Amino acid sequence: MRVYHSNNFRSGCKIIFENEPYLIESSEFVKPGKGQAFVRVKLRKLLTRQLIEKTFKSTDYLEIADVIEHTLCYLYNDGFFWYFINNNTFEELSVEKKIIGIQKKWLLEQDTCIVTLWNNKPILVTPNTFVEIKVIETDATLKGDTINTGVTKLAILSTGAIVRVPLFIQVGSLIKVDTRSGEYVSR
């Protein structure tokens, strides 16, 4: 069993805490004037993306999580499973709908994404930070609407996602969206 000593906790380390995989977002070593030193850590649960804050003694240690990230190409879905392929080894991987979650609205066929495996089972799918998706439905704009008004309207994308876009965006436009926030970036 490989372990991380709490003094070696660094941002990006993946650990097992309470029998689940976590990602260390940040860690701070604290040496009070009186008493034992400790490490204050922000952890992100990889299964649910929940963020928690914990304090560990400087003598504590945690097991290293057997978490592997693969860059895979999204192929298709059948409503229950999403299928991905490794372009180097041509191995196919299926991921359940509940694991895909809300990320399904950012997955386009033939796009690459990161699939995180824990004990050789998929636990998380992370799409590219920016994706270009076609607008299939939006309100018509009136002549005279300009870019500088700061006013937005709703647009439905080909993946089913709903995004606020500027007034000049029309049906059929290809727009760039930030998948982390779900916001329009550019066209």
Swiss-Prot record:
PROSITE patterns: EFP
UniProt PTM: May be beta-lysylated on the epsilon-amino group of Lys-34 by the combined action of EpmA and EpmB, and then hydroxylated on the C5 position of the same residue by EpmC (if this protein is present). Lysylation is critical for the stimulatory effect of EF-P on peptide-bond formation. The lysylation moiety may extend toward the peptidyltransferase center and stabilize the terminal 3-CCA end of the tRNA. Hydroxylation of the C5 position on Lys-34 may allow additional potential stabilizing hydrogen-bond interactions with the P-tRNA.
Any one annotated GO CC term: cytoplasm
InterPro entries: Elong-fact-P_C, NA-bd_OB-fold, Rib_uL2_dom2, Transl_elong_fac_P/YeiP, Transl_elong_KOW-like, Transl_elong_P/YeiP_cen, Transl_elong_P/YeiP_CS, Transl_elongation_fac_P
UniProt name for this protein: Elongation factor P
Molecular function per GO: translation elongation factor activity
Gene name, Swiss-Prot/TrEMBL: efp
Keyword entries, A-Z: Cytoplasm, Elongation factor, Hydroxylation, Protein biosynthesis
Cellular localisation: Cytoplasm
Record-listed N6-(3,6-diaminohexanoyl)-5-hydroxylysine modification sites: K34
CDD domains (UniProt xref): S1_EF-P_repeat_1, S1_EF-P_repeat_2
The keyword Repeat appears for this protein: no
GO BP annotation list: peptide biosynthetic process
Pfam families: EFP (PF01132), EFP_N (PF08207), Elong-fact-P_C (PF09285)
Main location: cytoplasm
